[in-house]
């Protein structure tokens, strides 16, 4: 037979219930589903892929190219010495998240490219996982549709990944004064200007957001 555990009684003879243990476990971040378009929706304007009103570059990189980059970072870290931290942040572009699924798999998987690149770097180099941070916010405005860059918001999320890796405290978004400029058309429109598909980009411009720090800083 098992031994029964008797709960203690208080002065009134009532059985005391042990208090619930407090948990400080952080809430898990919900990763949005990727709504990848069908390959039949893709149009080509030179080396640019246009799906709907979004233009994207689909990069490819051979192992030798990736190894060459990692070798350069390794050499830089060695030249700077042990007293200087070398930090590498390699990031995907919008094609990794918003292109048809077959365009970011296999040799076109930017996640695989980044992972391989980091694996070729010396152990002394601090590598930043900006990919996962961006992936968690793909339902937000983190990449332009008419430009090959990330938006200011996308850059902010990569900055928070950098801070987490480097041991810094990221400045929260609500600590900035924000504003917006409308009707921005970027580099992808310029790259496709000689193709009829570029009109779609011109008719559906992006917007620019800016973030000004509320706190005044001084540098010498």
Residue ranges of each PLM-predicted region?
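Extracellular glycan-modifying ectodomains
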Residues: 1-220
């Amino acid at each position: 037979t098992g031994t029964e555990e008797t709960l203690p009684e208080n002065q009134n003879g009532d059985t005391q219930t042990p208090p619930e243990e407090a948990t400080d476990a952080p809430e898990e971040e919900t990763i949005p589903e990727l709504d990848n378009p069908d390959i039949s929706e893709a149009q080509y304007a030179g080396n640019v892929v246009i799906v709907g009103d979004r233009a994207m570059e689909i990069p490819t990189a051979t192992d030798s190219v990736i190894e060459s980059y990692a070798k350069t970072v390794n050499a830089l870290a060695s030249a700077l010495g042990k007293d200087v931290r070398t930090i590498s942040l390699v990031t995907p572009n919008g094609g990794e998240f918003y292109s048809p699924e077959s365009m970011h798999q296999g040799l076109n998987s930017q996640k695989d490219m980044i992972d391989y690149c980091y694996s070729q770097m010396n152990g002394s180099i601090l590598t930043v996982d900006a990919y996962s941070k961006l992936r968690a916010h793909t339902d937000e405005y983190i990449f332009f549709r008419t430009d090959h860059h990330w938006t200011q918001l996308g850059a902010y999320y990569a900055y928070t990944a950098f801070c987490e890796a480097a041991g810094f405290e990221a400045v929260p978004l609500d600590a900035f004064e924000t504003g917006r400029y409308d009707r921005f058309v970027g580099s992808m429109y310029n790259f496709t200007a000689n193709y009829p598909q570029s009109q779609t980009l011109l008719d559906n411009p992006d917007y620019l957001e800016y973030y000004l720090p509320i706190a005044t800083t001084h540098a010498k």
